[in-house]
Curated annotation (Swiss-Prot):
This is UPF0114 protein YqhA. It is a multi-pass membrane protein. NCBIfam families: HI0507 (TIGR00645). One of its GO terms (biological process) is response to hydrogen peroxide. The lineage of its organism: Bacteria, Pseudomonadati, Pseudomonadota, Gammaproteobacteria, Enterobacterales. Its main location: membrane. It comes from Escherichia coli (strain K12). It comes from the Bacteria. The gene is yqhA.
Amino acid sequence: MERFLENAMYASRWLLAPVYFGLSLALVALALKFFQEIIHVLPNIFSMAESDLILVLLSLVDMTLVGGLLVMVMFSGYENFVSQLDISENKEKLNWLGKMDATSLKNKVAASIVAISSIHLLRVFMDAKNVPDNKLMWYVIIHLTFVLSAFVMGYLDRLTRHNH
């Protein structure tokens, strides 16, 4: 009975495979939105104010960072929790594949969230005259919470690695 339960639990990790595949579909949706934004901006590029263009560019950078985060979570999560990726030697392989454990992934995700939050906060500040003060305050508080959380996670990771 114990062996059966252990084997069943171990096999259940494959339930994550469709979830990671779903992230690849989310990546397709993000890419479509990215190019929709570019197509929307190009006809108006010469009549746009510089600040409006910068806001669009920040939005594109934001989407790119989210896309990178999706790829990192998708591949690292799959390799850490489901199965090793068998990529043929002839194909280009990302140099970090197989080297990122769950803790490294967590720290990279935290750093990515801080970067994404920074871009979002910059976009908000560029349009600060149209944003109520209390909303600005909450954006800053939330961003600082992300920064502090990432710092604490990195610090705790460093402590545990140093003690082992």
